[in-house]
Amino acid sequence: MIRLLGQSEYGLYALIGSLIAYFSVLDLGLGNAIVRYTSRNRAVGDKQIEAKLNGMFLILYLIIGILTIFIGAIIYFYLDDIFTNGLSTSELRKAKIMVIIITINFAFSFPLAIFGSIIQAYERFVIFKLVEIVRILAVPIITLPFLYLGFGSVAMVVIVSVVNIGSLLFNLYYCFKYIKIKFHFGKIDLTLLKEILGYSFFVFLGVIVDQIYWNTDQFILGALVGTVSVAIYAIAMQFINMYKRKQYEE
């Protein structure tokens, strides 16, 4: 991929990826909360309460999706000021296009993410992992032909976004077709909401720390040095991530 893109183009892709990774913080730990509270309600067997839970979580994610658009717009308009020393004019133009695409991706992904969490709560782990495997494999399989045809980092972001939303739409289809989930949009139980937010806060805190620790450095390199340095650093980070995964397996 680096050979086909070149250091500068790959560095731009890695830089925008690290910047937009902060969008994942907006999940607020709700994904884990959905699994926990849906699983707990399944033990009770009250479908009406489950429908209310689904409705409440979907409303929260819709709000987060709208918030994502506003944050993406702010990043877009301030991109020139942030990376004026590190990126060229053509790189800034591509970066803005990539920010728009990824912002749209996340704006749709947050509301759709509820269905993947519901699948986990219903212990349909095989189908959930199968979708994840297909999504992971589909990205390089689709991307490589486009790279050989001369497309660059913008095309990669488009492919990643389309594959991601496609996998989330499959989760939506599976939930309605096979799990038969329902949604009820009534008055929100504020006591339950407070309990859920209290639970998800610590997950949210962990995500923030993780993002600051692993993604801030690429952002700083891009702002002060340039995309080539980001590319070299991103390659080194790949080896660190491989080592981390090996540790978790052991």
Annotate each language-model stretch with its function.
Residues 1-21, 153-158, 191-203, 216, ...:
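Interfacial/gating helices of multi-pass transporter permease domains
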Residues 2-9, 126, 137-169, 231:
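Membrane-interface helix-loop junctions in multi-pass transport and translocation proteins
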Residues 5-13, 45-55, 66-103, 148-158, ...:
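Membrane-interface helix-capping segments at transmembrane helix termini in multi-pass transporters
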Residues 6, 23-63, 82-85, 115, ...:
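Transmembrane-helix boundary and interhelical linker motifs in polytopic inner-membrane proteins
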Residues 14-42, 61-68, 104-112, 167-170, ...:
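Small-residue-rich midsections of specific transmembrane alpha-helices
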Residues 74-77, 87-112, 129, 141, ...:
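Alpha-helical transmembrane segments of multi-pass membrane proteins
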Residues 106-134, 154:
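Membrane-interface junctions at transmembrane-helix termini in multi-pass inner-membrane proteins
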Residues 160, 171-215, 229:
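Interhelical loop/hinge segments that connect adjacent transmembrane helices in multipass membrane
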